[in-house]
């Protein structure tokens, strides 16, 4: 992988370790659980990742067919611990739309 001027990734050769590092964790809220009915999944990803890289990472990790990727940068939230005020770390949110035949099991039953 090489970096451009604006720290965007360009995948010359897809390295599996780089793809695994792009996707951090699934975001599970009331809104995202409603999106599961429409076969859309929400993940927190690396802020410098592009839609093409996110699509390649999801297809590699979960072995599914991705039909669409929407991304946004949510605003930082203030956080206070005692008298110290700070902000939560910056992240990028990606909403992934899968093909109708595919699904990701976010809640495994044990």
From Swiss-Prot:
One Pfam family it belongs to: Ribosomal_L23
BP GO annotations: translation
Single GO term (MF): structural constituent of ribosome
Keyword annotations of the record: Chloroplast, Plastid, Ribonucleoprotein, Ribosomal protein, RNA-binding, rRNA-binding
Recorded GO CC terms: chloroplast; ribonucleoprotein complex; ribosome
Gene3D superfamilies: 3.30.70.330
Main location group: plastid
Keyword rRNA-binding included in the entry's annotation: yes
Protein location: Plastid, Chloroplast
Entry's family note: Belongs to the universal ribosomal protein uL23 family.
General function of this protein: Binds to 23S rRNA.
Subunit structure: Part of the 50S ribosomal subunit.
NCBIfam families associated with the record: PRK05738.2-4, PRK05738.3-4
Protein name: Large ribosomal subunit protein uL23c
Organism of provenance: Porphyra purpurea
């Amino acid at each position: 992988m090489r970096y451009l001027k604006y720290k965007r990734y360009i995948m010359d050769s897809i390295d599996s370790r780089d793809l695994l590092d792009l996707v951090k964790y699934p975001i599970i809220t009331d809104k995202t659980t409603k999106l599961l009915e429409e076969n859309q999944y929400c993940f927190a990803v690396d802020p410098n990742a592009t839609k093409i890289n996110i699509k390649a990472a999801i297809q590699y990790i979960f072995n599914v067919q991705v039909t669409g990727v929407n991304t946004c940068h949510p605003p930082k939230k203030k956080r206070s611990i005692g008298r110290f005020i700070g902000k939560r770390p910056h992240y990028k949110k990606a909403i992934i739309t899968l093909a109708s035949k595919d699904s990701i099991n976010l809640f495994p039953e044990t």
